[in-house]
Amino acid sequence: MKKYFTKQALKDGFNIMKAAGSGFSNDMALKFSASLAYYTVFSLAPLLLLMISLAGLFLGREAIQGELFKEINGFVGNDAAKQIQDMIARLELTGKSTTSVIIGSITLVIGATTVFGEIQESINIIWQVKAKPKKAWLKMLKDRLLSGSLIISLGFLLLVSLILNGALSALNDRLRTYLPDITVFIFYVINIVLSFAVITTLFAVIFKVLPDAKIAWKDVRSGAIFTSILFMLGRFLIGIYVESSANSSTYGAAGSLIAILLWVYYTAAILYFGAEFTKAYVDFKGKRIEPADYAVHVKQMEVERDVKKLPKKIDKETGKSIESEVKK
């Protein structure tokens, strides 16, 4: 443990953070965050509905929905959480005709997977990789299937999280009668550790699976752990800011929507900074994030060129071209 707090280790960590911050600025990651927040407005309800449906196959749908919205309420406030709940209720396919269910299901899947496509494209730019343009429809199909697998993973993580929380809650109630003070602290720490593990797993899957790149698991692990720490620290501050902004009379009736947009915007900024940190960490190790077999590496260069002649102009009267030199 001491090796992480030596003078050299702290210096290396500072250099990695400096490179990550520089990349975050140069790649205009905040624009990606704003773009993701916009897409999430349309994808959030379908995504949550699919997650609830998948987890509901194993546990009670109402129990899962209740726990999920309790977590969302902690992130964006009661009004915004209620608005998300209403959006999901309108997307329910029960009681509709077969044709409506089929069309609605397709629309639901496309809407839910769009947000992952946006994340993939943004991380590709940050990691300087790009899929080859050939067979674009195959690439699109693959991306949709990949996004679908991530939704299944999210549903599984939600299920595991709820099961563990339920088991811990039952154990907490039993032990509290014997050790009331110590039990509260112990289970508070356990809850933080479990939340950290789930969030780290989610970020690791995103960094490893979504981009069109090859990256070792140990490099993914370092980036995911850093991003999770950043997320856990930022979640509390973001929650306070979003809540105070949403309750402001400045936004009026749109306060709930603004709360959702702000929360996704700042969460996306943390995700993309984590991607920049992962790239900076890999570069520091003397390696490079390689493109996948179906992708290529993209290099950006700034080129200055002296122009000796201006573009040709056409004389309106004679119809002849006029060449002119640049005055020095």
Annotate each PLM feature.
Residues 1-328:
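Membrane-embedded alpha-helices and immediately adjacent juxtamembrane helical segments
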